[in-house]
Amino acid sequence: MRRIQKIMNDWTFIYHDGTKTVLNLPHTWNAIDGQDGGNDYWRGTCSYEKIFAMPEFDAETELVYLQFHGVNASAKVVLNGKEVCTHDGGYSTFRNDVTTILEAENHLVVYVDNSVNDRVYPQKADFTFYGGIYRDVELLTVSKAHFDLDHFGGPGIKVTPEVKGKNAHIRVETWTSVPEGEVKVTLLDAEGKTVAEGTGTNTVLNVKNVHLWDGVADPYLYTVKAELTVNGKAVDEVSASCGVRYFSFDANKGFYLNGRPYNLHGVSRHQDFKGIGNAITKEHHDKDMELIREIGANTIRLAHYQHDQYFYDLCDKYGMVVWAEIPYISEHLANGNENTISQMKELIVQNYNHPCIVTWGLSNEITISGRALKKQMLENHRVLQKMVKEMDPTRVTTLACYAMCIHWNKVAHISDIVAWNLYLGWYVPGFFLNDWWIRLWRILYPNRCLGFSEYGAEGMPNLHSGKPKRGDNTEEYQNKYHEFMLECFKRHPYMWGNYVWNMFDFAADARNQGGEPGMNHKGLVTFDRKLKKDCFYLYKAYWTEAPFVYLAGRRYEYRTEAVTEITVYSTCKEVSLYNNGKLVETKKGEHVFKFKLQMEAENHLEVKAGDCTDSAVIYKTDKPRPEYSAAKVDSSNWM
């Protein structure tokens, strides 16, 4: 049976200048210079070396594969002086059989390249392309008779559920390395009890009274196990989680899950952390999911590339509906078509079994660089669309259009559904334009599903204003923007899904704004995940039900205005504000409560909503605090 041995420790990293460092994986060489601004982080080729002993295996009956789960962006793998493989694409799994190359002591060298080129995506985008081996590396030992390991990094098993009334048919396809042998398939429920069994490499399991995977309310998972036997002996086994669900998109009613309206409201997520980059661990993934669940999101756009398998597993487990995509972004590369195809094939093959995924993203803001290579770009999208629908007819395709991509741009009408990255009220003045834009789409294309793939505004927890303005990067303007957008979406319930950009601040080394270069500050949570901005609680007030109350503006501690506005976010219907122990006012409402407060020299604020309380202290001052504002710069928008 298969065995996995991680090889994560005691690698020798050789930087481009020849400097050697012994370290443990995961690792990126851009953890610091990719986050400090200047658009000057080092991109090129570095190498990683590892000495390891031959794993225990039976050379007559077993094989050993070398497996990588994420090397950005291109890799050349050399073992004992022999080239094993190359791989272009920094976000997916790849593996190769190294059995015949192994020796008693093995010298592994991985050349990793994130340099600028015209063939491997991404090359131009508003995030840092960290170089390194930033996910797990493993030795995988299997029987020579095994479930397939050589097809686009996939698991060798494909599970396709189909709901039939209260029952379900679950088709299980497997591929094996040998024609002989028998495959037995077993479906287990969440308690590990056998529900159905079948045999063969293409079998259908019939399940009566099926328990549906029903989003965040009830993300029920079965497990499919496939066992390969040769001459009566079990030689290999693979398994996959199976969530049985059905869904649809309607231009007039939005998204449906299991036959019921299911309003998709959620966030986008980048995978990097402050000081760590993309070299993150399971604990980091767990933290992200914990925070996303806290605000009540039910969908995640995993931007702009394939994420770690562990995070897709978390989405399955917690019922998050997922938009998965490849990094075909910002600019069509003259020689990049083949790479978009290979990355899409890997994305689908490696993630097909995840019930959380409902849509495959073809591209993001691909028209942002203008009309260059427009014909080639459109044709490549048509090729991708056709290929994806052939590989997976059970899901829909989508893409994210750039704000300046007009409604009737041809690329916006290739995928099954579409969404827009719109920052009206941030990069462009006028909150009202969001409603106008959505209504115009409805007039022009009443039968085409529309979503917002990105919307947001920068918000720095250290910048504040009593009169926030577009572009000032204050926490107060970010609040104002998101307060409007949440009400805007309520006016357009037919939209298929809307995604905050972004759940977390993330690195974009070309940026310089808000006094902290190298960062995109649109997150609801800071880059280190330690501080929840005010608007985090705004979304929690809209998307959750458990009673809580939050006093916004607590970091706007020193204020010059004689009468200041106090904002409170709560799931409760009635909120009372107290200052220095005296009741100021009680208000009834939903989600957002605004109070006018006559400032005293020192103000000990307390808000009460049922049994929930929160407090803060603010002060009246004569002069504005200089640290509450940041100097204007030219590169606030990376484009």
Q: Which stretches of residues belong to each language-model region?
A:
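Substrate-binding/catalytic cleft of secreted carbohydrate-active enzymes
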Residues: R171-E173, M289-I292, T299-Y542, A546-T564, ...
